[in-house]
Swiss-Prot record:
GO molecular function term, any single one: N-acyltransferase activity
GO cellular component, one term: plasma membrane
Active site as annotated: 295 (proton acceptor), 360, 413 (nucleophile)
Keyword Acyltransferase: yes
Name the UniProt record assigns to this protein: Apolipoprotein N-acyltransferase
Pathway: Protein modification; lipoprotein biosynthesis (N-acyl transfer)
Gene3D superfamilies: Carbon-nitrogen hydrolase
PANTHER family on file: APOLIPOPROTEIN N-ACYLTRANSFERASE
Bilayer disposition of the protein: Multi-pass membrane protein
One Pfam assignment: LNT_N
Keywords: Acyltransferase, Cell inner membrane, Cell membrane, Membrane, Transferase, Transmembrane, Transmembrane helix
Domain of life: Bacteria
Function: Catalyzes the phospholipid dependent N-acylation of the N-terminal cysteine of apolipoprotein, the last step in lipoprotein maturation.
UniProt source species: Rhodopseudomonas palustris (strain ATCC BAA-98 / CGA009)
């Protein structure tokens, strides 16, 4: 039997599968697809799994099985299989305080993937509406999943984690396309490229025509590689003059970060680590311009603790600024009890004065707030951080101006995964700062996925990104995504580095999602116009 004959038999088995067999095929294909993401980056598996997705939708149009619901159900199983192994690490957060939250572990591991899989189901259903029995069905799937992934990233606060386009962000040469078309444009190309082998089983065409579509897909992949290689070559890492960074990664256990009685130990660890000598020529914190501590670093309100502020002032030499995460109380009348707070970044001068503050805008549902907060608290629910009333959201994203370094754009925790929220406009900063605490997720794939998505924001904007994480991975990333320096997951220490200089604003930085929107519109028009009957 020829290779095409074997492939055709496999495809026929998938197309004709029904009931539980069809669900299992979709589930396994989705699970295998998760290996395309960090830390595995085994994206060639998508050359297997996305053709299976095409054949599953082919099967929903076979005989009496015709219909959108059949495609949607296949999409749901594919998405569920994709998100469970891709997001399993979220369950670790529910074990930090196991006595309170362990009972919610099944909901975290299965409930969130079940919800996110609804968007994959929507993508398959939309693809089925646009379906036709020729090579254009590849584009139908690509544009439909791009739309559904965009919706996943925006509806109900949005969660674009592990969008399919992230499969083509490693190696770094492939990721450079994101500087033009963003993650949503890259998602469209990713699905189209990897789904293309599905047409090899199509009948009624000669061998040359059958191979034309995969050949074009490989051509796009080659063009992305060439473009990325040229961009990397033309953008060597350059450093800003007279700016030295020190990132402190304390690797504190989660319970210490929320235990007020541990405040003295926490401060002592921060102070000693920050002034650690890293070599025979190092003089500790006196060598640095910017000392950087991670997200919500203290088990207390920093600005209300005079002793802690005095210790920071004593630590910092003249000309050094501390950038640190901290929980910030709102301004209240005297005597009013504090019940809510902001998740913030402080810039603190050598005399202990607060130079500027940024309050986190995009809060984490169920981590920093609960939907219908008051009602949920009345029936006994609390979010993971146990802040009564939930955290407050900031008013607007703004640059932090510094006396000894270029202005920075602050991003706290998973704010770095939302590309279109980094609206820089005319007030372009010199770099981006991402403070996070991935210690919630243990030694798992979660922190690596978070790092990779933050790297893409650097490439999109042409700006360096500096990342300080409680347990890692802390890193200094140049404007084309190179990791200049890093401190690994689960490591205690400090990371010294220069500050990479930005490159010219990218196309994405100038026009945002416009190229991706144009690409989606053109593909949609091509699919719709070709569906019209002759003479219409």
């Amino acid at each position: 039997m020829t290779r095409r004959g074997v492939l055709s038999r496999i495809a026929s088995g998938i197309i004709l599968a029904w009931g539980w067999k069809r669900a299992v095929i979709a589930l396994l294909a989705g699970a295998l697809s998760s290996l395309a993401m960090e830390p595995f980056n085994a994206w060639p598996v998508l050359f297997i799994t996305f053709p299976i997705a095409v054949w599953l939708i082919d099967g929903s149009a076979a005989g009496k099985r015709r219909g959108v619901p059949a495609a949607a159900m296949a999409g749901w199983w594919f998405g569920f299989g994709y998100f469970v192994p891709g997001l399993y690490w979220i369950g670790y957060a529910f074990l930090v305080d196991a006595d309170t939250f362990a009972w919610l572990l099944p909901a975290a591991i299965c409930g969130l993937p079940a919800y996110l899989a609804l968007f994959t189901a929507l993508g398959f259903a939309l693809a089925r509406l646009l379906w036709r029995p020729d090579s254009l069905r590849i584009l139908s799937l690509a544009v439909s999943l791009t739309i559904s992934e965009w919706l996943r990233g925006h509806l109900l606060t949005g969660f674009p984690w592990n969008a399919f386009g992230y499969a083509l962000t490693e190696p770094l040469v492939l990721a450079q396309s994101i500087s033009v078309i963003g993650i949503w444009g890259l998602t469209l190309l990713t699905v189209a490229i990897f789904a293309s082998p599905a047409v090899l089983i199509d009948g009624g065409t000669n061998t040359r025509r059958r191979w034309a579509v995969p050949a074009m897909a490989l051509g796009v992949l080659a063009a992305m590689t060439v473009f990325g290689g040229i961009r990397l070559k033309l953008s060597p890492t350059q450093l800003v003059d007279n700016v030295r960074l020190r990132i402190m990664q304390p690797n504190l256990p989660q319970d210490a970060r929320f235990n007020y009685s541990a405040k003295a130990d926490v401060m002592q660890k921060y102070l000693s680590l920050s002034d650690r000598s890293t070599g025979p020529k190092s003089t500790g914190v006196r060598d640095v311009s910017l000392l950087i501590w991670p997200e919500s670093a203290f088990p207390f309100f920093l600005s209300r603790e005079a002793d802690a502020m005095a210790q920071i002032a004593e630590l910092l030499p003249k000309g050094t600024v501390l950038l640190t995460g901290a929980v910030r109380p709102p301004e209240l009348p005297p005597g009013r009890r504090i019940t809510r707070a902001y998740n913030s970044i402080y810039a603190i001068d050598h005399d202990g004065s607060i130079l500027s503050v940024y309050d986190k805008l995009h809060l984490v549902p169920f981590g920093e707030f609960l939907p219908y907060q008051n009602l949920m608290e009345k029936i006994g629910f609390v979010q993971l951080t146990k802040v009564q009333g939930g955290f407050l959201s900031g008013v607007a994203r703004h640059n932090l101006e510094l006396p000894n370094a270029p202005p920075l754009l602050p991003l706290i925790c998973y704010e770095a995964i939302f590309p279109d929220e980094i609206a820089i406009g005319n007030n372009r900063p010199g770099w981006m700062l991402n403070l996070t605490n991935d210690g919630w997720f243990g030694i798992s794939s979660g922190p690596y996925q978070h790092l990779q998505q933050a790297r893409m924001r650097a490439i999109e904007q042409g700006l360096p990104l500096v990342r300080a994480a409680n347990t890692g991975v802390s890193a200094v990333i140049d404007p084309v995504g190179r990791i200049v320096a890093e401190l690994g997951l689960g490591v205690e220490g400090v990371l010294d580095s220069g500050l990479p200089a930005p490159v010219a604003p990218t196309i994405y930085a100038r026009v945002g999602e416009l190229p991706a929107a144009v690409l989606v519109a053109l593909v949609m028009m091509l699919v719709l116009l070709r569906k019209r009957p002759p003479g219409s």
